């Protein structure tokens, strides 16, 4: 679902930071 994709994107942002 969009919620799952959003969660993965958020995690990627944290790792990138």
Swiss-Prot record:
Tissue/organ expression: Expressed in skin granular glands.
Keyword vocabulary terms for this entry: Secreted
Record's GO cellular component terms: extracellular region
Compartment(s) of residence: Secreted
Known role: May act as an antimicrobial peptide.
Family of the protein in this entry: Belongs to the Frog skin active peptide (FSAP) family. Septenin subfamily.
Protein's name in the database: Septenin 1d
């Amino acid at each position: 679902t969009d919620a799952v994709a959003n969660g993965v994107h958020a995690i990627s942002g944290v790792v990138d930071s």
